[in-house]
UniProtKB/Swiss-Prot annotation:
Pfam families, per the entry: Ribosomal_L22 (PF00237)
N-terminal signal peptide: none
Swiss-Prot/TrEMBL keywords: Ribonucleoprotein, Ribosomal protein, RNA-binding, rRNA-binding
Keyword Hydrolase: no
GO cellular component annotations of the record: cytosolic large ribosomal subunit
Protein name: Large ribosomal subunit protein uL22
GO MF annotation terms: rRNA binding; structural constituent of ribosome
Lineage: Bacteria, Bacillati, Bacillota, Clostridia, Eubacteriales
InterPro entries registered for this protein in UniProt: Ribosomal_uL22, Ribosomal_uL22_bac/chlpt-type, Ribosomal_uL22_bac/org-type, Ribosomal_uL22_CS, Ribosomal_uL22_sf
Subunit field text: Part of the 50S ribosomal subunit.
Family in the record: Belongs to the universal ribosomal protein uL22 family.
A GO BP annotation: translation
Gene that encodes the chain: rplV
Function: This protein binds specifically to 23S rRNA; its binding is stimulated by other ribosomal proteins, e.g. L4, L17, and L20. It is important during the early stages of 50S assembly. It makes multiple contacts with different domains of the 23S rRNA in the assembled 50S subunit and ribosome. The globular domain of the protein is located near the polypeptide exit tunnel on the outside of the subunit, while an extended beta-hairpin is found that lines the wall of the exit tunnel in the center of the 70S ribosome.
Length: 125
């Protein structure tokens, strides 16, 4: 496993823009539905899909895609017109546990799930 410094010296990751959102208060299952729509698409097409998809994850992913694009163009000097969504995945974060009171003094547990979302954009060659 390489450290951040070693990766920088070797130039690893200079061909991509990456954005990670951690602890997003949305279930990873719901995020994956929208992620599957934009995987492998050109960046402009991905923006259009996210803008017109009526899901809660769409607005979160729109901002994340914007950040990944900015990282690719500003930090790594990639051409915006050739960018596409190379990788997109959502992993499960820690689950917040809450209690819902029920009849006769019992209680149910509510699981409020969180996700770690990663978007990677690369240049098409």
């Amino acid at each position: 496993m390489l450290t951040k410094r070693e990766k920088k010296e070797l130039g690893i990751g200079k061909d991509q823009g990456k954005a990670i959102l951690r602890y997003a208060r949305i279930s990873p299952r719901k995020v994956r539905i929208v992620l599957d729509l934009i995987k492998g698409k050109d960046i402009d097409e991905a923006y259009a899909i996210l803008r017109y998809t009526p899901k809660a994850a769409s607005s979160i992913l729109f901002k994340l895609l914007k950040s990944a694009e900015a990282n690719a163009t500003n930090n790594n000097g990639l051409n915006r017109d050739n960018l596409y969504v190379a990788e997109a995945y959502a992993d499960q974060g820690p689950t917040l546990k809450r209690i819902l009171p029920r009849a006769r003094g019992s209680a149910d547990r509510i699981r409020k799930r969180t996700s770690h979302i990663t978007l990677v954009v690369k240049e098409r060659s």
